[in-house]
């Protein structure tokens, strides 16, 4: 099952020693059977995710997901991630989306279906282990469901990241991400890692079969969807603002060239404003040099709550 490519770069991944019985989907280490993460820990944290979905629909979705996973594994394994070598007839919308995400995010595949474990109770296979352009380790899970359950996949990948670092003592996971692949739609979502304390509580509850345990995501439900919408809007707005500035510069140059002060059109008026100098009041300097005067002419006002957002470049 495990497909590792140690020839890409100088990152070498360790063998966990876990044996996977693919026909029965069971994991073994030294004769002891280990539990899969999704069927135990994720199920305990999110027990009712698929309760209202008919089994036939779940089976069809699982089959579709297996096909997508297999095509990605073949692309990275047999064809070494070279899209020029991949057979034209085997391309799918999902695979094209996948390749686009890999290129956009500067990723290279180190291993597919890479098995990690805590060497005691659990084992699972990570869909893809990647290195980014800086050599940082990125763990990726592929999802093909109609709805992306951000909180669930964030927990799943956080557990994988912990086990990955246990198997590979000298390596640290830089980030975890989900590739959502659904027809010609695709989305690359970088997720936050769940803290070790929360993972400890979940594992303890599962091992003790604690029926009173209830998982509470550190990042509440619905946040990631809003985050992604905000990021996409910000990128679109940023691109439009750049285009708008470029067009304004061209209009300004055209008006200069024609010595025009103003154009009035059906859309509005365009007025050339010549360069000038201005003055700005330095309130910080006044506060430093004459604090009594500054206090005399300032007044307090109520400022409404706001949100400060700093996106990664």
State where each predicted segment sits:
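Short, conserved glycine- and acidic-residue-centered signature motifs
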Residues: 153-156
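Metal-dependent nuclease catalytic regions and adjoining charged, substrate-binding loops involved
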Residues: 151, 162-253, 259
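Metal-dependent nuclease catalytic cores that hydrolyze phosphodiester bonds in DNA/RNA
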Residues: 1-123, 249
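Short, flexible loop/turn elements at secondary-structure junctions
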Residues: 114-116, 130-132, 144-146, 180, ...
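Short, mixed charged/polar active-site loops
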Residues: 121-123, 137, 186-188
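Conserved catalytic cores of phosphodiester-cleaving nucleases, focusing on short active-site segments
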Residues: 68-69, 124-146, 160, 233
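Short glycine/serine/proline-enriched coil/turn segments at secondary-structure junctions
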Residues: 118-122, 149, 168
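Extended, charge-rich alpha-helical segments
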Residues: 98, 232, 238-313
